[in-house]
Amino acid sequence: MNKSYFIGLMSGTSMDGVDAVLVKFSGDTPSLIAHHSEEIPAALLRNLQKLCLPGNDEINRLGHLDRAVGKLFAKAVNTLLDKAGVDKLAVIAIGSHGQTVRHMPNLEMGFTLQIGDPNTIAAETGIDVIADFRRKDIALGGQGAPLVPAFHQQVFATPEHKRIILNIGGIANITYLPGNTEAVTGFDTGPGNTLMDAWTQYHQDLPYDKDGAWAKTGTTDDKMLLHLLSHPYFSLAAPKSTGRELFNQAWLEQQLAEFNHLSDADIQSTLLDLTCFSIANDTLALSTMGEMYVCGGGAYNTELMCRLKQLLPHYKITTTAELGINPQWVEGIAFAWLAMRFHLGLPGNLPAVTGANRAAILGGKFSAL
């Protein structure tokens, strides 16, 4: 059977599910053939959230969750292929990002750790797996993130326009495509949905604030917003990346000590503005006008999109759907693309973005045989 497909697997810092995509490439141009989102079971989600918090972790828990996430990713692949009516023998490789449980690239011995055992995925799908995409970049002195700007450049760049590709998952990141000979720039701007989701889960017993409806009922506290924006991360120069190790519920509770007079809704509104202002500040530092295309879960938050448009009046702001890719599936397709790059022996990182000392082929192969 002729092998012609790649599969991309992604679970981001929001931990809102495993996205699986079936992709066919013509050169670097992807065609999305099928997609599937696999829910993370509640017990597994709770254990993953515990593992992501700074502290002393049990090796047993890590090992168990590594296998459990691998099995969940494999289930997502098998369901995807069933839905698409595609035989596993037609798939060249799976590109699996895994689930990040630590991302600490700025230590003296920086590291990043994604779990979701690729051996388990290969064994339970019968398909070769390309995984462990971030650690080569860190070994070369880089941040290991963000990796998606290389994909954004290949798929979304145009010489006619300055474009920002904004991904809002748990953490938000931007890719600046200048449309000329300037180097592509990309970095994490700070919290995306992670703080808003944590606050909503704690006070509303809901997984997230749908459409930003709860935030819309509150009033942003300017003093609290300025306090949050004074965090040193926001003034760091690129390359930079961050994660739940820094911006999490425990950190938020520490910041709220002098703001306990605010209502829960006012705090939610302020957290939404923290995301929007940090994105807008970094965007304006790159260019005062242009086009912005949003992907990730934040693209569906109507209040967030509305506030971004108010902060960036000289930007045309819409979602990546206008460029032909549904915002939910952009990152999954990016990891199918990275698997394709590995298969062809081509580099997958942009040193100007990550800070690595050279471009490199990312990932390792885990054979199904």
From Swiss-Prot:
Top-rank lineage group of the source organism: Bacteria
EC annotation from Swiss-Prot or TrEMBL: 2.7.1.170
GO biological process: 1,6-anhydro-N-acetyl-beta-muramic acid catabolic process; amino sugar metabolic process; peptidoglycan turnover
Record: residues binding ATP: G12, T13, S14, M15, D16, G17, V18, D19
GO molecular function annotation: ATP binding; kinase activity; phosphotransferase activity, alcohol group as acceptor
HAMAP family: AnhMurNAc_kinase (MF_01270)
Protein name: Anhydro-N-acetylmuramic acid kinase
Organism, scientific name: Shewanella piezotolerans (strain WP3 / JCM 13877)
Organism ancestry: Bacteria, Pseudomonadati, Pseudomonadota, Gammaproteobacteria, Alteromonadales
